[in-house]
């Protein structure tokens, strides 16, 4: 069975900046609304079908949560759905924010 990979926030930012990957955030709606990584798609049970229709299965997908734990399960789920290159962002949004990477806030 295929497995997801791990990526640090700097590597994730580099892929996103070059337009080579799609970032999804699986945190709760309130946390996402307060602040999220720039250009992140809020992936929920309600938005997964829409996401799967919009994104090519060959396009790398980066999964972000709070601290890099929950994202691993979601990343494996996306692999199981047929996405070919899926990464769990180590450290999650907390590490992204600590690294002063681009954030969209309300």
From Swiss-Prot:
GO BP of this protein: glycerol metabolic process
Location, primary (coarse class): cytoplasm
Catalytic activity: thiosulfate + hydrogen cyanide = thiocyanate + sulfite + 2 H(+); thiosulfate + [thioredoxin]-dithiol = [thioredoxin]-disulfide + hydrogen sulfide + sulfite + 2 H(+)
Top-level taxon in the UniProt lineage: Bacteria
Similarity remark: Belongs to the GlpE family.
Protein's UniProt keywords contain Nucleus: no
InterPro entries on file: GlpE_sulfurtransferase, Rhodanese-like_dom, Rhodanese-like_dom_sf, Thiosulf_sulfurTrfase
Signal peptide range in chain numbering: none
A GO cellular component annotation in the UniProt record: cytoplasm
One Pfam family linked to the record: Rhodanese
Record domain Rhodanese: where: 17-105
GO MF entries: thiosulfate-cyanide sulfurtransferase activity
Task performed by this protein: Transferase that catalyzes the transfer of sulfur from thiosulfate to thiophilic acceptors such as cyanide or dithiols. May function in a CysM-independent thiosulfate assimilation pathway by catalyzing the conversion of thiosulfate to sulfite, which can then be used for L-cysteine biosynthesis.
EC identifiers of the protein: 2.8.1.1
Name the record gives this protein: Thiosulfate sulfurtransferase GlpE
Active-site residues (renumbered): 65
Species per Swiss-Prot/TrEMBL record: Vibrio vulnificus (strain YJ016)
Lineage: Bacteria, Pseudomonadati, Pseudomonadota, Gammaproteobacteria, Vibrionales
Keywords: Cytoplasm, Transferase
Subcellular location as annotated: Cytoplasm
């Amino acid at each position: 069975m295929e497995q997801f990979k791990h990526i640090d926030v700097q590597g994730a930012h580099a892929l996103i900046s070059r337009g080579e990957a799609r970032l999804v955030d699986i945190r709760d709606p309130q946390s996402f609304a307060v602040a999220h990584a720039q250009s992140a798609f809020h992936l929920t049970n309600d938005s997964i079908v829409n996401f799967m229709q919009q994104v090519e299965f060959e396009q790398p997908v980066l999964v972000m949560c709070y601290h890099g734990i929950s994202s691993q399960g979601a990343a494996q789920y996306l692999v199981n759905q047929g996405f070919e290159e899926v990464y769990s962002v180590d450290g999650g949004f907390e590490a992204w924010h600590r690294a002063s990477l681009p954030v969209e806030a309300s």
